[in-house]
Amino acid sequence: MSHINHLLNSDEAIPSTALRSCAQRSPMSSDDELVGTAGYRENQPVPGSTLPTSPSDVSTDTENDEHQRLLCQWDACGSEFSQPELLYHHLCQDHVGRKSQRNLQLNCHWGSCTTKTVKRDHITSHLRVHVPLKPFSCSTCSRKFKRPQDLKKHLKVHMEDTMKERSRAAPGSRGVRKTGVNKGSALQEKARTLPNLTVESFVSQEMQNYYPYYKSRQHLDETLSHIILPPPAALGGTLASEPPSYTRKAVSFFTTLSQDMSRRLPSLAPCNSPGPAGKMVMLPRPEQQYARVPRYPAMPELPPLVTSPGAESHALPRGHNFRPAPLIPGSMLPSLSRFSHDKSQFVARNSYSLNQKASLNEELCENELDIALENLALDDTDALRAELQTVNIIKDYLTCLLLEDVYTESFELPASVEKSHSTLRKYPQIKV
C-alpha cells in the first residue's frame, strides 16, 4: 500500500508518454480559448522581442501585458496594434484598398480564410469576423454606440462641459499651486508662457517631440493643459485630409497616454467612502476610542470611616477594629496667609527649555509640511483627472474620425431600399 501511495504522490513515477497522452485527451483550457481569430494571446511574448534586463524594463513589460496586442495575419503581415479599431482600419485601408486607388482586394487573405466577395462593403463587413471589435464606448461616461458617427455626436456634450470649466478658471491659474510647495518659478513661468494649441497643430507639430507618458522630461503634463478642443459645432478639421497612417499614429499615442494616466490615479478610496454594500464606514473618534479604556486599574472600595459607635458596628466588618482619627483643633492649623507670597510658585508657566522649544518647532514644521503635501497631492490628482478627461475626449474623437468613412460605406443602404422605404406609411390605408 505504501508503494502505491509513493507512486501516486511522485511525479517522476509517471512516465512522460502518459503525461503527453493525458494532455492530448484533456479539453481545451481557458488559456487556449483566449487565442481568437485576431491571433493574439494574453501574456504571450511577441516573436522577436527580447527579455527585460533591468527593473524598469520589467515594470514596463508588466504594464504592457495588461493590454492585449493584436497581430495582423493578412498574408503574414505581422503588424502589431494595441486596439481592435486600429487593426480594422489597417485592414480596410492597407490590405483591402479602394477601387479609385487601383488596389481593391475583394478576397479575404486572413490566415487560412478563403472568403470571396463582390463588393468592398462586403469584405469590410466580413473582416469583423476576424477582428474582435466592440461597440464604440465613450471613455468619459461609458455610454456605448454602434457607429462612430453616433459617438462623435455624443462627444459634443463633453467638449462643451470641458470648455465651460476652462473658461470659469482664471487665466494662468492652472500653473499656480494652492499651497506653498511648488515646482519652481522656472516651470511656472514656462507654463504661463506656453501658447494654446489645437488638436491638429499638436498632432502635426508637437506630438513627435513627446513620449506617450504623463510625467516625462519634456513636461507633457504642462502642454496638455494648453490644448484647445475642437469646437463642437464643427467637428472635422484638417486631420480628415491627412493620410490614414497619420491619424492612426495619433490614436495610438493618445491611447497609450490615457492608459498611463489611468495607472497614475490613486486606486485607494478614502476611509469614509461607501463600501461595496453601499454602507458608510465611519471610524470612531480618538476621544471615543480611548474613553472605553480605563486610565487606572479598578480597585476594591474601602469601607467608609465613621465615628459613631452604633454605625461602626453595622458598617465595619467583623473582626476588624479601626480606631477613629484624632481630632485636631483649628487653632493649631497654619493659616493660608503664610502661603500667599509663594502663590506664584504653584501657578503654571508657559516656559520651556531650549530642547523643548526645538522639539515643538519641529513638530509644527512637520505638521505644516504634511498638510501642504496632502493639499499638493489633492491638487495634482484633480489636475490629472481633468487632463485625463481631455485626453480621452481627443482619443475618442480621433478614433471616430478614423473609422467614420469605413462605417459610412458599410451602413449605406442601396438606392432601391431607400426609395421603397420612403413610400412606407405608419398606418395601413383602409379602403371603404
Curated annotation (Swiss-Prot):
Protein task: Transcription factor that mediates regulation of both acid- and alkaline-expressed genes in response to ambient pH. At alkaline ambient pH, activates transcription of alkaline-expressed genes (including palB/RIM101 itself) and represses transcription of acid-expressed genes.
GO BP field: positive regulation of transcription by RNA polymerase II
Biased composition (Polar residues): 46-61
UniProt cross-references to SUPFAM superfamilies, sorted A to Z: beta-beta-alpha zinc fingers
Keyword DNA-binding annotated: yes
Extent of motif YPX[LI] motif 1: 296-299
Record GO terms (molecular function): DNA binding; zinc ion binding
C2H2-type ZnF: 70-95, 106-130, 136-158
Annotated S-S bridges: none
Gene (name only): RIM101
Classification via InterPro entries: pacC/RIM101, Znf_C2H2_sf, Znf_C2H2_type
Motif (YPX[LI] motif 2): 427-430
Sequence similarity: Belongs to the pacC/RIM101 family.
Summary of subunit composition and partner proteins: Binds to DNA. Interacts with RIM20, which binds to the two YPX[LI] motifs and is required for proteolytic processing.
Organism: Eremothecium gossypii (strain ATCC 10895 / CBS 109.51 / FGSC 9923 / NRRL Y-1056)
Keywords, alphabetical: Activator, Cytoplasm, DNA-binding, Metal-binding, Nucleus, Repeat, Repressor, Transcription, Transcription regulation, Zinc, Zinc-finger
Cellular compartments annotated: Cytoplasm; Nucleus
Keyword Ribonucleoprotein: no
Protein name in the entry: pH-response transcription factor pacC/RIM101
